[in-house]
């Protein structure tokens, strides 16, 4: 939102949230836009409640205050639940404001990916390969659980899930 370089120590959101920033939300507000942000975690995480005000957002929707915690993944609300609950809020915003700008902060792709087994999207991480049977000379298809249960495998499952969640979100906004 600002194209700022990170702080040399600490974090901008915690150490420098009270500064004056040139940001996309502020620039768009000068053009008559309403700006909002939403996150499936609480507003105190990375001091977003204060920082988003400094960035010029009119409203910050967050985990504990604005969403029903009905499905968690990792650090907070699952992306599918987050988007499902965000759609009516965004539709209401679009009825009240001709021009608006929104930032949606997802959580599923955030480490750790230990909850990958909770995801309802299936991604086959099985490696398939062919091998010639020495006794018969025939080619056989074999499988191995190549990435199942690994960090990279869990990450790929979370990306697959997030992709499906974004697709459903877009469909729901269009409905």
What residues fall within each predicted segment?
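Solvent-exposed soluble domains appended to multi-pass membrane proteins
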Residues: 1-175
């Amino acid at each position: 939102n600002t194209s700022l370089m990170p702080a040399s120590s600490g974090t901008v959101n915690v150490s420098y949230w009270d500064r004056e920033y040139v940001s996309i939300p502020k620039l768009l507000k000068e053009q008559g836009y309403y700006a909002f942000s939403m996150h499936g975690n609480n507003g105190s995480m990375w001091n977003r409640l204060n920082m988003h005000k400094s960035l010029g957002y009119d409203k910050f929707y967050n985990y504990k205050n604005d969403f029903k915690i009905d499905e968690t993944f990792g650090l907070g609300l699952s992306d599918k639940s987050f988007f499902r609950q965000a759609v009516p809020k965004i539709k209401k915003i679009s009825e009240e404001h001709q021009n608006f700008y929104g930032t949606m902060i997802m959580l599923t792709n955030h480490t750790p990916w230990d909850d990958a087994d909770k995801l309802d999207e299936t991604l086959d991480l099985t490696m398939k390969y062919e091998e010639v049977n020495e006794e018969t000379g025939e080619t056989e298809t074999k499988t191995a659980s190549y990435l199942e249960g690994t960090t990279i495998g869990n990450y790929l499952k979370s990306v697959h899930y997030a992709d499906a969640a974004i697709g459903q979100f877009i469909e729901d906004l269009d409905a």
